[in-house]
Amino acid sequence: MNLNATFFAQMVVFFILWWVVAKFIWPPLVKALDERAKKIADGLAAAEKGKAELELANKRVDQAMAEARTEGAQRVADAEKRAQLTADEIKQNAQAEAARIIAQAKAEAEQQVTRARESLRDQVAVLAVKGAEQILKREVNAQVHADLLNQLKAEL
């Protein structure tokens, strides 16, 4: 192997170049790479934090939706209950009114029956008096007596 001055000169230039790169170029390059790695790590951490916050927000939204659904269902149930109570009250009022009308009609019918009976009693009394008058005016004959009774039956 042939070692000459060019080889040593190249070695000196190489070490000088290496020292310049190590002293002036390498530290800013490493610093830039470290900053870039830190930015990437911070970005990933921020993304994870954002993802966690998004999941938390989604959970809160789901919880709020569930509460809204529950509240809506409760309101619907309350409205249905109020409607049922109102319907029951209307039915009770209608039944009470119907019972009152029926009672009034029964009382009126009872009064009409009573009036009709009184009227019939008066008419029967008048007819009985007439029949007795006619029987007393005529002589007692079985055939005439039967005819008068038949005539009274027809008038009643």
Curated annotation (Swiss-Prot):
Membrane topology: Single-pass membrane protein
Matches recorded under InterPro entries: ATP_synth_B-like_membr_sf, ATP_synth_b/b'su_bac/chlpt, ATP_synth_F0_bsu_bac, ATP_synthase_B_chain
TM regions (residue ranges): 7-27
Intracellular or extracellular location(s): Cell inner membrane
Keywords recorded for this protein, A-Z: ATP synthesis, Cell inner membrane, Cell membrane, CF(0), Hydrogen ion transport, Ion transport, Membrane, Transmembrane, Transmembrane helix, Transport
Pfam assignment, any one: ATP-synt_B
Annotated GO CC locations: plasma membrane; proton-transporting ATP synthase complex
GO molecular function, one term: proton-transporting ATP synthase activity, rotational mechanism
Quaternary data: F-type ATPases have 2 components, F(1) - the catalytic core - and F(0) - the membrane proton channel. F(1) has five subunits: alpha(3), beta(3), gamma(1), delta(1), epsilon(1). F(0) has three main subunits: a(1), b(2) and c(10-14). The alpha and beta chains form an alternating ring which encloses part of the gamma chain. F(1) is attached to F(0) by a central stalk formed by the gamma and epsilon chains, while a peripheral stalk is formed by the delta and b chains.
Family under the similarity heading: Belongs to the ATPase B chain family.
Reported function: F(1)F(0) ATP synthase produces ATP from ADP in the presence of a proton or sodium gradient. F-type ATPases consist of two structural domains, F(1) containing the extramembraneous catalytic core and F(0) containing the membrane proton channel, linked together by a central stalk and a peripheral stalk. During catalysis, ATP synthesis in the catalytic domain of F(1) is coupled via a rotary mechanism of the central stalk subunits to proton translocation.
Protein name: ATP synthase subunit b
Species this protein is from: Cupriavidus metallidurans (strain ATCC 43123 / DSM 2839 / NBRC 102507 / CH34) (Ralstonia metallidurans)
